[in-house]
Amino acid sequence: MENSNLFSFFVPLVGLVFSAIIMVLSFLYIQKDSVN
């Protein structure tokens, strides 16, 4: 039961981290493109 609760907490957290990483990568890509 506790494992399932941890899993239901972990999945949205991974999604949030994943979207944050994508935002940072796209931001860095735009910065690099504007510098060039």
Swiss-Prot record:
The lineage of its organism: Eukaryota, Viridiplantae, Streptophyta, Embryophyta, Tracheophyta. It is a single-pass membrane protein. The keyword Cell membrane does not apply. The chain crosses the membrane at residues 10-30. This is Photosystem I reaction center subunit VIII. PANTHER family: PHOTOSYSTEM I REACTION CENTER SUBUNIT VIII, PTHR35775. It is found in: Plastid, Chloroplast thylakoid membrane. Keywords: Chloroplast, Membrane, Photosynthesis, Photosystem I, Plastid, Thylakoid, Transmembrane, Transmembrane helix.
